[in-house]
Amino acid sequence: MRFADVIGNADVAKALISMADSGRVAHAMLMYENEGCGALALALAYVQYLNCSSPVGGDSCGECPSCRQMAKLIHPDVHYVFPVNKGPKTTDDKPTSESYIKYWRELAVANPYFTEADLQRAIGIESKNGLIAVAEAKAIISKLSLTAVADGYKAVIFYLPEKMNQETANRLL
């Protein structure tokens, strides 16, 4: 997703672009929003901009290999974490975001302004509360310990980090 595709939040987008252009990229950022207002879209646009090999006019080019991978949410150095639970779309005993990544990609590519209820429907856990469990923290630590596949930044985008339990949060610290 390019900044040009983000609805609203122009001031925030401008600040993110300025930080990236000046080389002041924070090791962690928290984007807080009212549900469906665009924090995920901004995060996706920012990570795409950071990894774009040919940014143009304060936005990612949308054409380089990194941008094409980001458009499909398949960039090898960008990982996604979101609340999950056991459901009919996975056979994993301890599901992680990776268990449902196919459904996440479909949902986020179609509409990066989706809600928690949209996510629960997409991954088949409408009647359960999603959470980010310790197994997820272990998976993220493992992924981040690997060498980057491409040039640019490695990133983890957490959707609804407030769904992380205390043990998971402590593990990530």
What is the predicted role of each segment?
Residues R2-K163, E167:
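Clamp-loader machinery-focused feature within the broader ASCE/P-loop NTPase space
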